[in-house]
Amino acid sequence: VLFELDAVLLAQGVEGIAVGLASKILPHNFNELIDASIAYLRGESFELYPDFPSGGLCDVTRYNDGLRGGAVKVRARINKIDKRTLAITEDPTHDDESIKESIIKANDKGKIKIKKVDDNTSDQVEIIIHVSNDESSDRTIDALYAFTDCEVSISPNACVIMDEKPHFMGV
């Protein structure tokens, strides 16, 4: 696939929908794409996994080379500022508004206990979470991953049009 797909397609990733057809190609690190291409040309084995430019953590255990049925679990990076303050500083999905809304919903449902959420995002993600006095920050972090969009599973679906027909392929 490395030679059939434009490197920009793999580097940037793509998501789109057509009539009866959908495609989701996750972004990859350009330098790793070059290294994989060189390994491929030399007949060497290589591994190539998604790399989200907006940071965060990524579990590729079930990636399955980008084929349908695979999945990638991604997590926002949550840092402790102090005992009662957390900061989300990296978001692989680059959808900080969804994260903020899911935190507020989880708090309203009693899944997490927070005082308030401040979204200071500009060029970089920065969502500040003020933890309730009767809750530990460690438990809040666990709950944020369990009950909000701070952790989501993404299923790749690499569908490309070749010879005027859709083809599903892996990386």
Predicted segments, located by residue:
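Intrinsically disordered, low-complexity regulatory segments
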Residues: 1-171
